Amino acid sequence: FLARLREGFSDFQKSLAARIFAAIGSGFVAALGAWNIPQISGLNNPLFWAFVLGCAALGAVIPHAGALASFIVLSGALLACGAYVPGILLLAATGAWWFVGRQGRAAANGLLSFSLFSAVGLAPASALFTGYVTRIPQAVATAALGGLLCLTCAGFGSMDLTNWDIAHNW
């Protein structure tokens, strides 16, 4: 087993892992957004699950499109709650990121790592992860949008940029 692990992972295994990560991340960001839209929030609402599962499925098939869709849902949540400036800023930054990040799975996974890692207090590790898996222009754009995401999540209740802990602030 260890000898095979040293040989590395096949392209199929890397692609599968990237798509699973993108599906989980897209679903998580969409859930965060849908939970904060008053008209569709709640686990009993089928629209909540349509948004979450739709973004997760899109993330599994086309990771950058899943990231884009989930961030649109999150921006919509901010706009629906009356936070117009952060909602428009997040929407504009997401659109700008998409022009750089749509060229592969790595930038999408780097962006989605900000939400997943921040949920357990590891936001600084997501910047390292993003820099490791992407080229410099993609890493800069992804880190900028990830920083805006961390700032937005801090405004949801934790008031801490790097330690937004989902267990205490959901």
Q: Language-model segments: which ranges?
A:
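Core alpha-helical transmembrane segments of integral membrane proteins
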Residues: 13-81, 90-98
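Transmembrane helix interruption/hinge and helix-loop junction motifs
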Residues: 38-44, 60-65, 78-85, 102-104, ...
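Juxtamembrane/interface motifs at transmembrane-helix termini
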Residues: 86-91, 107-108, 148, 161-164
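Aromatic-anchored segments of alpha-helical transmembrane domains
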Residues: 74-83, 94-98, 115-122, 148-156
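Cytosolic juxtamembrane amphipathic/interface segments immediately preceding
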Residues: 2-17
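Juxtamembrane/interfacial segments around transmembrane helices
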Residues: 72-81, 99-103, 139-148, 168-169
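Generic multipass alpha-helical transmembrane bundles of integral membrane proteins
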Residues: 117-118, 122-170
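Cytoplasmic-side transmembrane-helix entry/capping segments in multi-pass membrane proteins
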Residues: 67-75, 88-89, 105-117, 141-145
